[in-house]
């Protein structure tokens, strides 16, 4: 109930709010001038922003098995990374100490914290298939994760405290930054900053993919990283072949009834090579296959995501508001809708209601019921994919 109350108002795209967030730029102007082109610094992008989570709550999340977390410590020039789940008592002692040069990072904080989810939805001008999550970092004085670069766009929003960012322009492919070998983090070797900026509470810094950045806490501070999903071509290709295989990819077995004794046992024969080539040539797919794969792939939850189902019965959908759970990803393409990795082909009369639920992440129960979706919505509610709260 608390989550729905806190998050309901911000799931709808609001251009005025986005212009304030982007320093007076409209989303269109920001995308044209800055997106994947050059950084943007906005002072006071979120006036009065004190953060979305407390230090104690972040430590509690880092101790959970269903949450991805890391503790990064630097001693002199040596780095140590401890992956979660982390021991809560030890984290609490560390957080209360005067130790410096350490950082606690929690990925997917928006799945467990309503205000972090609100922050993510402030970037609703980007397609939901591209929005990833909010990573929250708490750093003691001197803490950071070293100079690095990301392959995706990121918005860095400063919570409590101050952090200095050292920046370097992206290196064009195929010669990106070199990395320090054998380091526990992907650290840029010989990093040379070309600019520096200090973020204070409520400030926002956008960085395009590939920009080198090194954030160092000037005092104990929180930073909220709104990251974007950027699938790699090889990753998509491998997943697509798995998708085709599940749906009946040709699966012939190699046979060689005319096999003769091998004069050179280690040599791969031309017959086996020809067989492999022929099987690959038989693979066929349509645009529809690609669209279905992409929808399922982009809406599939990460492995550590767990939904909490509801056992409520006797719910009158027409009196409720349906609100997607923060962990739910609902997308659509044409006549296909995708809910957490599953595909749905609704009747034409049902598509508008489902599209509103997907786009706004909420929809009036009356509208869904009139579209004949009551049974489906209640199934999703029992699975924990969405919440049903009393309507206005």
Describe the residue ranges of each PLM region.
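N-terminal auxiliary "cap/dimerization" subdomain that precedes the catalytic jelly-roll/cupin core
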Residues: 2, 6-87, 91, 335-390
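Proline-centered helix-kink/hinge sites
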Residues: 39, 208-209
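Helix-loop elements that line ligand-binding/catalytic pockets
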Residues: 232, 238-318
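Residue-level signal for secondary-structure boundary elements
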Residues: 39, 43, 66-70, 128-132, ...
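Active-site region of the double-stranded beta-helix
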Residues: 16-33, 46-203, 211, 216-253, ...
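Acidic, low-complexity/disordered tracts enriched in E/D and polar residues
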Residues: 279-357, 378, 388-392
């Amino acid at each position: 109930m608390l989550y729905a109350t806190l998050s309901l108002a911000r799931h709808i795209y609001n251009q005025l709010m986005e212009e304030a967030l982007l320093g007076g730029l409209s989303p269109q102007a920001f995308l044209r001038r800055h997106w994947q082109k050059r950084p943007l610094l906005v002072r006071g992008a979120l006036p009065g922003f004190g953060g979305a989570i407390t230090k104690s709550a972040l430590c509690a999340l880092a101790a959970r098995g269903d949450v991805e977390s890391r503790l990064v410590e630097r001693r002199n020039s040596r780095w140590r990374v401890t992956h979660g789940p982390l021991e809560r008592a030890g984290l609490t002692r560390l957080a209360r100490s005067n130790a410096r040069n350490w950082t606690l990072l929690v990925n997917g904080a928006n799945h467990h914290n309503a205000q972090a989810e609100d922050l993510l939805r402030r970037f609703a001008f980007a397609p939901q298939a591209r929005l990833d999550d909010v990573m929250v970092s708490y750093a003691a004085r001197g803490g950071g994760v070293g100079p690095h670069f990301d392959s995706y766009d990121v918005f860095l929003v400063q919570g409590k405290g101050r952090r200095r960012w050292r920046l370097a322009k992206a290196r064009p492919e195929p010669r990106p930054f070199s990395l320090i070998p054998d380091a526990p983090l992907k650290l840029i070797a010989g990093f040379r900053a070309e600019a520096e900026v200090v973020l204070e509470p409520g400030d926002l810094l956008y960085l395009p993919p590939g920009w080198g950045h090194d954030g160092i806490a000037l005092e104990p501070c929180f930073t909220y990283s709104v990251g974007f999903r950027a699938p790699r071509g090889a990753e998509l290709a491998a997943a697509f072949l798995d998708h085709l295989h599940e749906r009946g990819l040709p699966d012939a077995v190699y046979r060689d009834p005319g096999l003769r004794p091998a004069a050179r046992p280690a040599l791969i024969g031309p017959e086996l090579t020809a067989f492999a080539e022929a099987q690959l040539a038989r693979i066929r797919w349509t645009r529809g296959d690609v669209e279905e794969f992409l929808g399922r792939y982009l809406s599939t939850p990460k492995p550590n995501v767990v939904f909490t189902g509801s056992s409520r019965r006797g719910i009158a959908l027409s009196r409720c508001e349906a609100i997607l759970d923060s962990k739910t990803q609902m997308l659509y393409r044409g006549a296909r809708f995708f809910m957490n990795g599953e595909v749905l082909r609704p009747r034409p009369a049902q598509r508008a209601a489902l599209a509103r639920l997907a786009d706004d992440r909420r929809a009036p129960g009356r509208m869904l019921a009139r579209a004949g979706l009551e049974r489906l919505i209640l199934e999703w509610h029992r699975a924990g994919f969405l919440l049903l709260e009393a309507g206005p």
